[in-house]
Curated annotation (Swiss-Prot):
Site entry (Reactive bond), positions: 377-378
Organism: Mus musculus
GO biological process: response to cytokine; response to peptide hormone
Record: glycosylation sites: 64, 101, 265
Gene that produces this protein: Serpina1e
Transmembrane segments: none
Span of the signal peptide: 1-24
Organism classification: Eukaryota, Metazoa, Chordata, Craniata, Vertebrata
Protein name: Alpha-1-antitrypsin 1-5
Subcellular location: Secreted
Length: 413
């Protein structure tokens, strides 16, 4: 008699709050000598870069008319941890779907790289708030394989919770409380429904709160037009910043590139395509170009106008990951026998990723002056982010992409 299938839920959450710092701006050039260049850090950053772009392109393929926002780190971490308990084709599909070449990289190196990344991300920083968390929620009569449990704790800093999934409302509350606490109340009710036979839930969250090194003055924020497409225009609060900024035009991408640093170890890369060049940007962008932008910093006098916004992403990862080759884990052929000691096979019934982004100007303190002084030898560029653009937020030590987004309509949350 074939044993019944028990359900496993994979829940991912991401939060990014970008808040301007009302402190005197730091005008020093970014010191790239402090970057963490260890092999483990470099390995994971390379693969996450490939994975982030592959995932982004799949989202664009599914819908190129809506905002996009997700955390490659959150998604990759959760699936990598799940691979600890997978076997056979299920195991291979997960790691290859995360862009790892299994003939060149050992599984031990992969998990060591994630361990190193999570240690880096959770490193205390007085100026930047960045933390991640992994929760394993296990039915109280289910026994996990000791090897899986030990490696999940050691490599992924996982916390384990025993819950009674027969009491679905109480089980949902335990899981949602974990995510809500980890994201400081920004993501609530992450789980809306649990399948009847759920016995195991893996939840991952990432929280990021950063303050700009070069702050925006709220008094300079004015209502302005944002061109969603050729026929749609919306009004948005447009922030303005002038000064020595890291901005240049990339002919390869047919786009303007703006790098903005946070107090702490994070950088945002904004990509504003020339008129009609969004598709070219999306098809041409690669991790090598982004790496050059991060390493070859150059400042010039410039002025930028960028919308204040709050957007979110909510994705069913089965439809997102399947085109990347991760399919077996979602069907009855899944082999997750390395997770539990029970005879009933596990299948991933749900994989949900939720992410929230806020770029705002809260607070009433006067910002340091960012007014240009003196004359220009040539006219400085003035960038208006008044049409769809992309952005990627990186952790500097590991150069790992924390968040990737596309703003099509800043009025849609």
């Amino acid at each position: 008699m074939t044993p019944s299938i028990s359900w496993c839920l994979l829940l991912l959450a991401g939060l990014c709050c970008l808040v301007p710092s009302f402190l005197a701006e730091d005008v020093q050039e970014t010191d790239t000598s402090q970057k963490d260049q260890s092999p483990a850090s470099h390995e994971i950053a390379t693969n996450l870069g490939d994975f982030a772009i592959s995932l982004y392109r799949e989202l664009v393929h599914q819908s190129n008319t809506s905002n996009i926002f997700f955390s490659p780190v959150s998604i990759a971490t959760a699936f990598a941890m799940l691979s600890l308990g997978s076997k056979g084709d299920t195991h291979t599909q997960i790691l290859e779907g995360l862009q790892f070449n299994l003939t060149q990289t050992s599984e031990a190196d992969i998990h060591n790289s994630f361990q190193h990344l999570l240690q880096t991300l959770n490193r205390p920083d007085s100026e930047l708030q960045l933390s991640t968390g992994n929760g394993l929620f296990v039915n109280n009569d289910l026994k996990l394989v000791e090897k899986f449990l030990e490696e999940a704790k050691n490599h992924y800093q996982a916390e384990v919770f025993s819950v009674n999934f027969a009491e679905s409302e109480e089980a949902k509350k335990v899981i949602n409380d974990f995510v809500e606490k980890g994201t400081q109340g920004k993501i609530v009710e992450a789980v809306k429904k649990l399948e009847q036979d759920t016995v195991f839930v893996l939840a991952n969250y990432i929280l990021f709160k950063g303050k700009w090194k070069k702050p925006f003055d709220p008094e300079n924020t004015k209502q302005a037009e944002f061109h969603v497409d050729e026929s749609t225009t919306v009004k948005v609060p447009m922030m303005t910043l002038s000064g020595m900024l890291d901005v240049h035009h990339c002919s390869t991408l047919s786009s303007w590139v703006l790098l903005m640093d946070y107090a702490g170890n994070a950088t945002a890369v904004f990509l504003l395509p020339d008129d009609g060049k969004m598709q070219h940007l999306e098809q041409t962008l690669n991790k090598e170009l982004i790496s050059k932008f991060l390493l070859n910093r150059r400042r010039r006098l410039a002025q930028i106008h960028i919308p204040r916004l709050s957007i979110s992403g909510n994705y069913n990862l089965e439809t997102l990951m399947s085109p990347l080759g991760i399919t077996r884990i979602f069907n009855s052929g899944a082999d997750l026998s390395g997770i539990t000691e029970e005879n009933a096979p596990l299948k991933l019934s749900q994989a949900v990723h939720k992410a929230v982004l806020t770029i705002d100007e809260t607070g009433t303190e006067a910002a340091a002056a960012t007014v240009l002084q003196g004359g220009f030898l040539s006219m400085p560029p003035i960038l208006h982010f008044n049409r769809p653009f992309l952005f990627i937020i990186f952790e500097e030590h590991s150069q790992s992409p924390l968040f990737v987004g596309k703003v099509v309509d800043p009025t849609h949350k």
